[in-house]
Swiss-Prot record:
Xref: PANTHER family: HEMK METHYLTRANSFERASE, MTRF1L RELEASE FACTOR GLUTAMINE METHYLTRANSFERASE
Catalytic activity as recorded in UniProt: L-glutaminyl-[peptide chain release factor] + S-adenosyl-L-methionine = N(5)-methyl-L-glutaminyl-[peptide chain release factor] + S-adenosyl-L-homocysteine + H(+)
Job of this protein: Methylates the class 1 translation termination release factors RF1/PrfA and RF2/PrfB on the glutamine residue of the universally conserved GGQ motif.
Name assigned to this protein: Release factor glutamine methyltransferase
Organismal lineage: Bacteria, Pseudomonadati, Pseudomonadota, Gammaproteobacteria, Vibrionales
Organism: Vibrio cholerae serotype O1 (strain ATCC 39315 / El Tor Inaba N16961)
Length: 286
């Protein structure tokens, strides 16, 4: 039986709708475009085109993964962040739009102080590469504990021809030479509590738990980074964190107790507390 593009899209949309996709028609179209290696305009222009059996078989494999709830970014192997097409894999978190708020605030502070930038827990390299793309004369370093993540970030830098970003594997500050100083340190660290029910829902089910979960009510890694960051910050440098919507007070308290100054929490595009930043100064203001 011959199957047209229009018929395949209709059947795929119905399957994904039944499996609970939030955007079944869009998902179906994107997956078919991926299999055909064609833009979406092709589907609209040639709705009566007959699809070959290998194409249908490839589409069904992708649909099965999506019906099981696997994130589209992992199925496609790519996600856009800060207008940069980034390769992603199950070894890294999927870059999210809310994290662009962290990039915006980092760029604001980078304009106030010269020096290199550091991204801790870099994953795909999304934050580091966004900053490097906007600040081509500044060196940006990204660090991730997982070797496969650091390698993926390097691959993304190469694919995007971004030459002022470098990536290392290691635990937080461990790969850095003693005496290395940065104008800004940014991080989207693990900040979810171990028993958070959201860990069993949606895309998060498929993402690496080590990049999501932290002890001490989700604050352990934020506390660790905050404690050691002054050793690597220039005088007047800034530390910026992405964190959970209900962690603003706790993160501000951590920074205040450690002597950071000019501490503020900023909201994401939905109006939720999302980024907290503080400034390191060798002399405390009166």
């Amino acid at each position: 039986m011959s199957v047209t593009i229009e018929a395949a899209l209709k059947a795929a949309t119905e399957q994904l709708q039944q499996s609970g996709s939030d955007s079944p028609a869009l998902d179906a179209a994107v997956l078919l475009c991926h299999v055909l290696a064609k833009p979406r305009s092709y589907l609209l222009t040639w709705p009566d085109k007959i699809l070959e059996k290998p194409t249908l078989a490839s589409l069904e494999l992708l649909l099965a993964r999506r019906r099981a709830g696997e994130p589209m970014a992992y199925i496609l192997g790519e996600r856009e962040f800060w207008s940069l097409p980034l390769k992603v894999s199950p070894s890294t978190l999927i870059p999210r739009p809310d994290t662009e708020r962290l990039v915006e605030l980092a760029l604001d502070k980078a304009a106030l102080i010269d020096g290199e930038l550091l991204d801790l827990g870099t994953g795909t390299g999304a934050i580091a590469l966004a900053l490097a793309s906007e600040l081509p004369t500044r060196q940006v370093t990204g660090i991730d504990l997982r070797p496969e993540a650091a390698e993926l970030a390097r691959e993304n830098a190469t694919r995007l021809a971004i030459h002022n970003a470098q990536f290392f594997q290691g635990s937080w500050f461990s790969p850095l030479a003693d005496g290395t100083k940065f104008a800004l340190i940014v991080s989207n660290p693990p900040y979810i509590e171990e028993n958070d029910p959201h860990l069993s829902l949606g895309d998060v089910r498929f993402e690496p738990k080590s990049a999501l979960v932290a002890a001490e009510n989700g604050l352990a890694d934020i506390r660790h980074i905050s404690t050691h960051a002054p050793h690597f910050l220039l005088d007047g440098g800034w530390l910026l964190f992405e964190h959970g919507y209900d962690q603003g007070v706790a993160v501000r308290t951590i920074l205040r107790d450690l002597g950071y100054q000019n501490i503020i929490t900023e909201q994401d595009y939905a109006g939720h507390d999302r980024v907290t930043l503080g400034q390191y100064k060798t002399e405390r203001e009166a």
